[in-house]
Amino acid sequence: AQLGSMSAASWVGRGVLIEGDPKVAFGDATQPLDGEEKPSDSFSFLLSGDAETVTVTLTDDEGNAYTAQLKDVKSGVKTYTLDDLENFQPEPGPPQDREYTLSFEAKNPEGDNPEISGLIQEQVSGVTMTANGAVLHLLNHDPITMGDVVVIQK
């Protein structure tokens, strides 16, 4: 999709979802360091097909991992909050005073497992036009191409 320079300029300031490992925190658990954004308790992923279960793994900076499941998830871009996760293993679940990196696994009983990719939200801070098309410069991420964008937000 070739975008003209005028339409590319309209991307500046917009939020985009791109593939990556989302970070989350429970409620008011963590205070961000100066200049850093506070992690949200919501997360998104892209699912290529319907899944009976999506296993969400929360891993803290020390490598401690906790898993929970989402049931009967339809294909597409999905957004949940940590409150949607139940039955954490191991019990009693993750301490709520730290940040976690998420990873995902989708499964079906027939073994026909859809692809699943974590999504991270970034903000477009600038656009460069190159011979290969527009390059989006993001606030907290390396530059990406238009093709790397999964969802455009307002």
PLM region spans:
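Type III/flagellar secretion export determinants
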Residues: A1-K154
